[in-house]
Regions:
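Glycine-rich, acidic loop segments that terminate in or are immediately followed by a histidine
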Residues: 1-2, 6, 10-21, 53-200
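A conserved active-site cap/scaffold subdomain adjacent to cofactor or substrate pockets
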Residues: 3, 7-47
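Charged, low-complexity intrinsically disordered tails and linkers
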Residues: 39, 48-57
């Protein structure tokens, strides 16, 4: 938020989205390397011409990787309309997404969710990307409270090793792999009990 205030007179929303994607992409590849010079160029803390070239190049590569991931993943999403009107979408990112590459499971789940929100325009949508011991949640127009859901899952499945959190409508949950089925089933029950908002 501080960076946005710093540059709001220079960049529009779309430019900032490109900078964010370039940072996300580069941070994935620089996990164990500080990459300070490159990050400074992405944030335009140096030369504007270098910033533009780097951001454009990284966004092009990131978008190509996202497109490739979604070509593999979208056909494997299972969608269910719940009695409360929510369209619940689940994707096994362990088995139906490329591993060890960009985008990672959380970003993949978010990109899948964004496309499903367009597909199910005007409807409440929840997307769960899950792996052997985690689930990533995204939602639109669903009255969820992920930190509260995590707390309840911890109490209801004490041997599940449940932890996690996030915001009200975006978050992640970790659990022990042997309890995945139980945790995901309880999570689906909780989503089915959520209220919904009008999609504007």
């Amino acid at each position: 938020a501080l960076y946005i205030k710093l540059v709001e007179d220079k960049y529009g929303r779309e430019d900032l989205k490109k900078v964010a994607l370039a940072l996300d992409y580069e941070a994935f590849w620089l996990r164990f390397n500080e990459g300070r010079g490159l990050i400074n160029d992405i944030l335009c803390l140096g030369r504007l011409d270098r910033h533009r070239r780097i951001v454009d190049l990284l966004c092009e590569q990131a978008n190509a990787a996202i497109d490739e991931q979604l070509r593999a993943s979208m056909g494997n999403v299972k969608s269910t309309k719940l009695p409360n009107g929510i369209i619940m979408n689940v994707l096994d990112v362990e088995n139906f997404a490329h591993k060890f590459t960009f985008p990672p499971p959380g970003k993949t789940s978010g990109e899948v969710h964004d496309r499903l929100c367009k597909k199910f325009e005007g409807k409440p949508v929840v997307t769960i990307g899950y792996g052997p011991d985690f689930a990533v949640l995204r939602s639109r127009a669903v009255r969820m409270n992920i930190p509260q859901m995590v707390k309840e899952l911890m109490e209801e499945i004490p041997n599940g090793g449940v932890s996690g959190g996030g915001h009200l409508v975006v978050g992640s949950i970790k659990f022990v792999g042997g309890m995945r089925k139980d945790v995901l089933a309880k999570l689906a029950e909780k989503i089915a009990a959520c209220g919904v908002d009008d999609v504007g």
